[in-house]
Amino acid sequence: AKEAKGDWLLYLDSDERIPVKLAREIQNTVADPKHQAYTISRYEVFLGKHLDHWGDPRVLRLIKKTALKRWEGKLHEQPKITGTVGDLRHQMVHLSHKNIDEKVPNTLKWSKMEAKMLLDAKHPPMAGWRFIRIMLTEFWYRAVRQGLWKDGTEGWIEIIYQMFSKFLTYERLWEAQRKPSLSET
């Protein structure tokens, strides 16, 4: 952020795109701002299909440079700002994974980081019943609350994959909590 030459910062991940309508809205907003930062909604594309039922994941991405205080978080870093936050109307496109070969390596990497954060936070010891509860909670959230099943095969794949992702994180936590660890035997 220190190297940015303009007064505003637009933070994007490599798999996010700014459509023309959003670009115009951003230009108009920074020309006459009402807030120090703005959230942008993401149009989720997973396995080449828009997921209507992913929800409206808003992310804080347009920030007046002087309002940015710091970044927080190890895995999904978030900007901490001073001032008010507004919402932009148009969506950015989030081109999530195109195939399973892209998705699995990221999940393996992130699950290690998430498990370490849970271990560092002194998560209660993992037991068999916790795995079942975690997986059922994830299923309920993705399938029932979000309604991803309505997005057809791609929705079901995402529901099952998110359950798998949660399982990996907590299985890694279980391994780390074991005494002696398997690597020491």
Q: Where does each model-flagged region fall?
A:
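N-proximal low-complexity "stem/linker" segments adjacent to membrane-targeting elements
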Residues: L182-T185
